[in-house]
């Protein structure tokens, strides 16, 4: 029992080490890796090589698939190029399996020692995250060594030998057991390594070992499909395409397993080494052979998995990929893109408000719906960011986290203000058959145009972080305040002139001017986050 527990803990350590490496690499190079993958989709060979390279760096084909799935879900990458990258990722993880199974036991303690020093010394810095990567690589090498040590006494048990002795000849059964190994161990690498160890110990024959390796590859595809079972349609298509490629490859090669085993058995290499090399070359040949069929596979996956029909017209979160939460760079980018959707909805609300001011009360219902949509998106962003490990974020990531929270909150508050403004216009002006004066309406239109321009510039500053645009936004905010004050005085002058329309709508008119000032402050606050300096006039603004 203790021996079995040692094996399970070693496999768990391998999975955890892979997770640590992936997290560290994504936090240091996440943005660059996203750029590499997004730019590589134009040509199949480039996309294939990008999948290999990124997977070799992050030590996990699942991590590469996660990035690609995120792009597909956001319509940044088509399904066919994404499948090419995933095929490259399969080759990359097989190559890393070969490298990691070399005798690198001396390197494990060195990597862990140096990694801990860097990670604890400068946890939030780039060096600290590279230390995390070193710890993860050290744990992977240590786990591989522990797996070999734990398997040895297990293979000597009579009961185990009887069980594995039954794996003789039924290639489909052997492949299914290999798939089960991969699913249980949560890692095709662990399953392949276990197979190689059993082969070296003489517990299983070489043909059975090849079947188990083929099954382990199939199991990794099943595992990805299970992990994405609750994801959106785009993510499930990527996982389905990867699984079908592995299934087709398995069905093609399984009938020739005994012939391959006989041919490879003539090589003067240990059987365990041959198992590892078969794993590498099988994936390489399979993936290269499947490249010409990615377009038909993409069409087939779209036919099998269709987009879910929207049961209601309410806006729903689109970019908040839960699988990206362990990768702050990617998660923050997702949240920022969702915040831009709030900005788009806010623009629609501003346009609707202008129509209400010009006597279209039917827009009020649409504005209430948009306000509800913005509240849904804001709540989703808030809960999404709350699930991120904030204490592990680097300084720049923490600042971006706060910017996204602040911007989404400001837009949500602005939507409430616009909804209230439209309701007051409908109640106090349209329902009472009272109209703004001609000059007053022109002034409100001018403020509206300036406010809409500031909103668009604010969303650009929020997304790009451009300092020049932030300074321009700050100046525009000040000009709006001056213009608002001038129009307030102009309205009072019309009251002194006994303008009947101005007198009838005075309370509403001044209230709208104050609300527009609050909206302007909410929109333009992002400028100070980018400039990182307080506004000396900020205390005089109304919020």
Swiss-Prot record:
Keyword annotations: Cell inner membrane, Cell membrane, Membrane, Phosphate transport, Transmembrane, Transmembrane helix, Transport
GO cellular component: plasma membrane
Keyword Transmembrane: yes
Keyword Manganese: no
Superkingdom of the source species: Bacteria
TM segment ranges: 1-21, 48-68, 76-96, 99-119, 134-154, 175-195, 196-216, 240-260, 274-294
Topology versus the membrane: Multi-pass membrane protein
A GO MF term: sodium:phosphate symporter activity
Enzymatic reactions: phosphate(in) = phosphate(out)
Principal subcellular localization: membrane
Localization per Swiss-Prot or TrEMBL: Cell inner membrane
Example GO BP: sodium-dependent phosphate transport
Pfam family, one: Na_Pi_cotrans
InterPro entries (UniProt xref): Na/Pi_transpt, NaPi_cotrn-rel/YqeW-like, PhoU-like_sf
Known role: Might be involved in phosphate export.
Family note: Belongs to the YjbB family.
Protein name: Putative inorganic phosphate export protein YjbB
Organism: Escherichia coli O157:H7
């Amino acid at each position: 029992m203790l021996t079995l527990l040692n094996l399970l803990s070693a496999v768990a350590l391998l999975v955890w080490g892979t997770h640590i490496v992936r997290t560290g690499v994504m936090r240091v190079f996440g943005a660059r890796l996203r750029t590499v993958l997004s730019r590589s989709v134009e040509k199949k060979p480039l996309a294939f090589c990008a999948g290999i390279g990124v997977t070799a760096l992050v030590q996990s084909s699942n991590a590469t698939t996660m990035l690609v799935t995120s792009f597909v879900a956001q319509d940044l990458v088509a399904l066919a190029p994404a499948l090419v990258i995933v095929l490259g990722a399969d080759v990359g993880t097989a190559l890393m399996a070969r490298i990691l199974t070399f005798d690198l036991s001396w390197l494990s303690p060195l990597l862990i020692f140096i990694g801990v020093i860097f990670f604890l010394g400068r946890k939030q810095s780039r060096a600290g995250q590279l230390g995390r990567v070193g710890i993860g690589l050290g744990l992977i090498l240590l786990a591989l060594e522990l797996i070999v040590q734990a398997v040895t006494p297990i293979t000597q048990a009579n009961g185990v030998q009887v069980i594995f002795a039954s794996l003789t000849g039924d290639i489909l059964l052997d492949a299914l057991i290999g798939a089960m190994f991969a699913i249980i161990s949560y890692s095709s690498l662990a399953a392949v390594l276990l197979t190689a160890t059993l082969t070296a110990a003489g517990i299983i024959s070489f043909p059975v070992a090849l079947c188990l390796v083929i099954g382990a590859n199939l199991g990794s595809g099943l595992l990805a499909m299970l992990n994405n079972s609750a994801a959106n349609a785009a993510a499930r298509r990527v996982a389905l395409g990867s699984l079908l490629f592995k299934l087709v490859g398995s069905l093609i090669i399984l009938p020739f397993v005994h012939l391959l085993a006989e041919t490879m058995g003539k090589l003067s290499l240990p059987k365990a080494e041959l198992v590892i090399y078969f794993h590498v070359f099988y994936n390489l040949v399979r993936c290269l052979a499947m490249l010409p069929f990615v377009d038909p596979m993409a069409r087939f996956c779209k036919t099998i998995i269709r987009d879910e029909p929207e049961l209601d017209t309410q806006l729903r979160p689109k970019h908040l990929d839960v699988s990206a939460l362990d990768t702050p760079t990617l998660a923050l980018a997702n949240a920022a893109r969702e915040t831009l959707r709030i900005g788009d909805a806010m623009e629609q609300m501003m346009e609707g408000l202008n129509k209400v001011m010009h006597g279209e009360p039917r827009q009020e219902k649409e504005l209430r719906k948009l306000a509800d949509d913005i509240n849904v998106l804001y709540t989703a962003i808030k809960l999404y960011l709350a699930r991120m490990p904030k204490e592990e974020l680097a300084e720049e990531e923490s600042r971006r986290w706060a910017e996204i929270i602040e911007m989404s909150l400001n837009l949500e508050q602005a939507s409430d203000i616009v909804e209230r403004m439209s309701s007051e216009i409908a109640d106090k002006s349209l329902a009472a058959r009272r109209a703004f004066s001609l000059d007053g309406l022109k002034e409100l239109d001018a403020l509206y145009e300036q406010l809409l321009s500031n909103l668009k510039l604010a969303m650009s500053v929020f997304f790009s972080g451009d300092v020049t645009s932030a300074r321009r936004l700050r100046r525009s905010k000040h000009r709006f305040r001056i213009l608002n004050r001038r129009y307030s005085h102009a309205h009072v002058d019309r009251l002194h002139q006994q303008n009947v329309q101005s007198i009838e709508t005075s309370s509403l008119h001044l209230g709208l001017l104050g609300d527009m000032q609050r909206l302007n402050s909410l929109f333009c606050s992002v400028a100070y986050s980018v400039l990182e300096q307080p506004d000396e006039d900020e205390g005089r603004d109304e919020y």
